[in-house]
């Protein structure tokens, strides 16, 4: 009961397999009337291309692609970075496969697992923990189409 705000931004909520446990913790941490702000996406239509890999920047190339673009490639001074987003919507799991290829030939690979239930399921988990949904902010003006900030409060 000591925090006024908890921010859960940039896909953090999707790293939690047990989201109800996360929301239960947040409700304990927040003071009455405190805010929980959670960044969520429409898992089937958000643009998984990382911003530095998007040549159009302000406009999503997804609008013009016949199929959803899930791969990113970025060339930095010392290494090349590639990533691919794979969604298994039947199991509510996505993987984000990353590869860093350095000039000396060394390669680093990593895979992040995201537990991506649809947004209504996540909102219901927050409400089951006692949160009140106050609103949803569309991030389209920040060039993040199909991405949102959900604003929850702990009851007084």
Predicted features and spans:
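A short glycine-rich, Lys/Arg-flanked "PGG" loop and its adjoining helix->strand segment in the class I
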Residues: 20-35
């Amino acid at each position: 009961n000591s925090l006024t705000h908890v921010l859960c931004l940039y896909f953090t909520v999707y790293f939690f397999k047990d989201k109800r446990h996360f929301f239960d913790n947040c409700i304990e941490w927040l003071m009455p009337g405190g805010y929980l702000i959670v960044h969520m996406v429409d898992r089937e239509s958000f643009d998984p291309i990382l911003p530095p890999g998007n040549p159009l920047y302000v406009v999503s190339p997804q609008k013009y692609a016949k199929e959803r673009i899930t791969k990113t490639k970025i060339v930095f001074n010392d290494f090349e970075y590639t990533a691919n987003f794979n969604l298994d919507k039947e199991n509510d799991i996505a993987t984000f496969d990353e590869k860093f290829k350095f000039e000396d030939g060394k390669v680093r690979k990593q895979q992040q697992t995201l537990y991506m239930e649809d947004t209504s399921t996540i909102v219901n988990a927050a409400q089951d923990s006692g949160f009140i949904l106050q609103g949803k902010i569309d991030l389209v003006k920040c060039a993040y189409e199909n991405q949102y900030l959900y604003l929850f409060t702990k009851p007084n």
